[in-house]
């Protein structure tokens, strides 16, 4: 039996559709109806249909259902059924209105899907149609009308109706898919393999993908793609992906879908796998496309492309020589050229007024060199995309410290300023102890070159008690010139700069080096641009320079000792999207991302050879997290609570355990990192220092000692400012700044909504500026026990904070064992986000 639909087409009769509609009318009155009664009414409707062949329409069927309900005395249900019919009619009308307005019939299915998935009255498409109509103009093209429809959904997003952002994302994805289909048809692309061939021929894809996989393997991998996962994105995330990460043609048209991007990255990251490679492609694709893990911005942007620089950040130790300083500047320029940020340690460079080759008082000091760093950051602007990003670190005992602390402030001599770099200070325990005890005590500043000349050692090469003994030895040595200041004056300079500019960043060097699992191979002088990396460092040195003849030509050959030029390979677990209580699943997902990061080391395009050498010696990775506040909110856990501290203590211990176990299994499969022997991993000291003495931990320590570790360093919590937007979650381990706000981007106001915002989570999402910062610091201290590197910890202050209160936060961070502090964010201060480390 065929039924005539409203649009004139026919479909086969399905009695279950009538039964479902009848049951819905009873649900709304909270009455029960037996299946027998339901099908009695259905039978009556069917009897009518058999008797009236010429009038078998949807509308006539619904009339008969109403009549039958009333005949059986179900008057309230009949009324609800009539209301249901009216609502369906109104939904069809608004659907038709939007379709007519866009001039695109193909959007109907998306709109019906939206009506089904967002059934609340506040998400009625009537609101969308009204807003859309107000934007439409007669001379608009079809593309402009679709853009206006997306804009209408975006503007309907509020903290009371946050899901409009997901509706906007679906409409944006429809628009993107439509463009991609047009591009594919024009280019003769009919399969994923066709697309990779086209992108490779156009120089938009690295040829290594097609060289590594057969056409059959690529088509098999194409079957892994799940377009349904596009629905996981909110508008902000999808818009950011579309504008900055998806591959575009030379004419700037999109040529890659979101799922194709994730599969392309997965294909690239799985290339080093010798066995079950497609299985790893699928695992990598799944954790990325489900938004459970985000790779660092450079990996997300550059994997699968010809210039596949996948690392976020680098750290260089600037030596105290003209050649060395300019080499470091060159290193920075090359890193910046390929989209990386850098941390530079200037603690070895002689201070202003120091001696050069016996000439007294002629050294210009570190500020002059930092101005060159500043100009390099501005000049090498990453193909016009954004200027370079660099943090410069100086020890708190360096003679040039007072001027250094005023690099970015607005007062003082502009010739001594460098507004485009990010200063950071390295503190020993002694400084904080003295600051806590008595701010009026004297602190003494030295020139590192003078200490080396007079004392025969570099003070910065020591930490802890040995550093303190040598520092006091320098203080008491009359041969050394000292610049003495009260700790109060130094602290005042630090805090004023922090409140005014958000910097200097803080690096607690004794805390860092005591916990260094690879102290047998060196020392950690400083961190990176975002303060989450803590790895062994040493200067690059020229050993010799020779003039040689090669193929009849005269060439100059330099022999260079590569030092330890740190590389940051980052990814983040999206805690808000992960089953944190499911230990088995968490172990599997952590193991998958650890393997992916280890493969980054093999696959990376290195801007300078020193980075490649260090990366292969240590094989360091930085697995971090995002969605920290998100994870707390969906579980109803308040930030300012002991429950928060206890819960995250367990979570980070599990993550650490899973990461160590995964790295050890990789070592068994592929070999341990070069310097494993003698490390705290090998001796077991790593586990003893952290009090990991349960049977499970002890068994893991034995396994690590026997099997080795694939990676010298494992965990580091980056800020994730960009990639957390993509994943639709909260940034890093920060509390949200606001539950809802509008952000201006290129003349448009974009809504930013706290993830999973609802009546249940609204009060859990307390603003960072209203949150007691001592809870954030205590939480960071608890996490730090389980993190072998560091974390990007921001402090949020209001205009009511006194300098003493800010100092107390720094002291508490040091006392809690926090290794680094990133920005001090004042409500009146705009600070630049680091996109390089936005993993």
Task: Show the residue positions of the predicted features.
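Core nucleic-acid recognition elements
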Residues: 9, 31, 36-263, 267, ...
